[in-house]
């Protein structure tokens, strides 16, 4: 199976399976001389780690990361990148493959079981193998490295919708995101989601979600016309995350409801001589190139396909049957997708910054300034 690598200059290759001995990634193309600590990578992983609330899978994985290549000890503490491939490894410690023994020959509705089997002639029934969201832990680790390539850039994400219940954007407070198990920026929505998800969980069902990712401090000039568009790469990055079924940039699909006057981001010249935008319907990207405004994207995550409700399916011999998926699963997998979305934004921006430097050789700036 190929296509395990993402990026052009800042390249991330992941490996390992959900129920294998370990998962890992190789980050290639990271510039030398960047300082970081294992604790910084671990802190990012801890935000995604399973088993932290009753609303995520109860699989107990500590996700302790090891840096096995590409760095040296820095004299002042921590590590420094050498410019060679950075290897990151996490051992799996809480696999329960026996939970899947009864359905080894059955295709779980909504999962990649049938398509993997049709393409490769075999599949890993133990938690889905490579198709499991377990793989995304390594994306988060890679994102922590990518952040070091992007000084001055802040990437944050939040959950804005679970099922039919959406936050009140007028109450958006980034400080609240780390204060609840949902990464929710609206404190008044937290108890509503709590009751709602408790009901979903007790029924043995699941529900989808929407995540919004915002990157601030992104310089103008990242991205390229036509086939190297920043927003195209962001869309590909988010769509590569397990269970993601839709992506929008800026105003997204809502732009189809607006007039040209409403959607256009008008510009003025500030007192410093630099132009600025009066709005950001474009989500910080015009013509595939960053404008200097915050880059804003959203992606939709479908309900977890593994549920306790019996569903009709077939086995590999074509026999119809009722299937109940055992094991430990997220009632809303979108919750833990929040740090994954941040990581993919970071990896794309790091890649595009290095590509910009390689092609243009300068730091992106506004094209006109007053002396």
From Swiss-Prot:
**Cofactors per UniProt?**
FMNH2
Which family is this sequence assigned to?
Belongs to the chorismate synthase family.
Catalytic activity as recorded in UniProt: 5-O-(1-carboxyvinyl)-3-phosphoshikimate = chorismate + phosphate
Name the encoding gene, please: aroC
Superkingdom per UniProt = Bacteria
Q: Note the subunit structure.
A: Homotetramer.
- One Pfam family per UniProt: Chorismate_synt
Q: What is this protein called?
A: Chorismate synthase
**Which biological process annotations from GO are given for this protein?**
amino acid biosynthetic process; aromatic amino acid family biosynthetic process; chorismate biosynthetic process
Residues binding FMN: 130-132, 242-243, 287, 302-306, 328
What EC identifiers does the entry list? 4.2.3.5
CDD domains found in the cross-reference section: Chorismate_synthase
Which keywords does this chain's UniProt record carry?
A: Amino-acid biosynthesis, Aromatic amino acid biosynthesis, FAD, Flavoprotein, FMN, Lyase, NADP
Task: Please name the GO terms that the record assigns under molecular function.
Answer: chorismate synthase activity; FMN binding
- Pull one GO CC term from this UniProt entry: cytosol
SUPFAM superfamilies per record = Chorismate synthase, AroC (SSF103263)
For the ligand (NADP(+)), the binding residues are 48, 54
The record ties this protein, via InterPro entries, to:
Chorismate_synth (IPR000453), Chorismate_synth_AroC_sf (IPR035904), Chorismate_synthase_CS (IPR020541)
Cofactor binding remark: Reduced FMN (FMNH(2)).
